[in-house]
């Protein structure tokens, strides 16, 4: 599984081997209101997240739970972003605002139970390293 994650990342990210990797997900919550029925619907997007401490860059690559393919990478360079911080509530997420028009919330985990919705990979050490990088080198707060 780890090799498949690495292969997908390296295939779409130039100099991908220079990045450390974790898997995570982002949630897109759509609010709806149809008269008496209202609520929200959440879409889960799986991500391969790479970070390079030297260039202070995070790259998010969308993927699917079975890692059968991936989308185009999005680069978040520390000197180009508007702000970045770790959000503890309601979920533990790494929030990056590339500009005033939008943001990405990266949720990462040591392990998960639901392998149909998420990429499953035990990643305690990698997550600790990413958290330290984000807090110490990338966060704007």
Which sequence ranges carry the predicted segments?
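Phosphoinositide-binding peripheral membrane targeting modules
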Residues: 42-95
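Short, surface-exposed beta-strand/loop "edge" segments at domain boundaries and coil↔beta transitions
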Residues: 30-34, 57-60, 66-69, 101-112, ...
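Acidic, Ser/Thr- and proline-rich intrinsically disordered linker/docking segments
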Residues: 74-75, 79-141
């Amino acid at each position: 599984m780890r090799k498949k994650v690495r292969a997908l990342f390296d295939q779409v990210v130039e100099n991908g081997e220079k990045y450390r990797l974790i898997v995570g997900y982002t949630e897109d919550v759509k609010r709806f209101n149809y008269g008496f029925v209202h609520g929200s619907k959440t879409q889960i997007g799986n991500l391969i997240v790479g970070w390079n401490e030297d260039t202070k860059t995070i790259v998010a690559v969308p993927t699917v739970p079975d890692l059968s393919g991936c989308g185009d990478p999005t680069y978040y360079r520390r000197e180009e972003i508007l702000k970045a911080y770790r959000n503890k509530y309601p979920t533990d997420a790494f929030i990056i605002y590339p500009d005033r028009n939008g943001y990405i919330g990266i949720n990462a985990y040591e392990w998960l139970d639901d392998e149909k919705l998420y990429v499953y990979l035990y990643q305690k050490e990698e997550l600790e390293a990413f958290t330290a990088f984000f807090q110490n080198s990338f966060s704007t707060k």
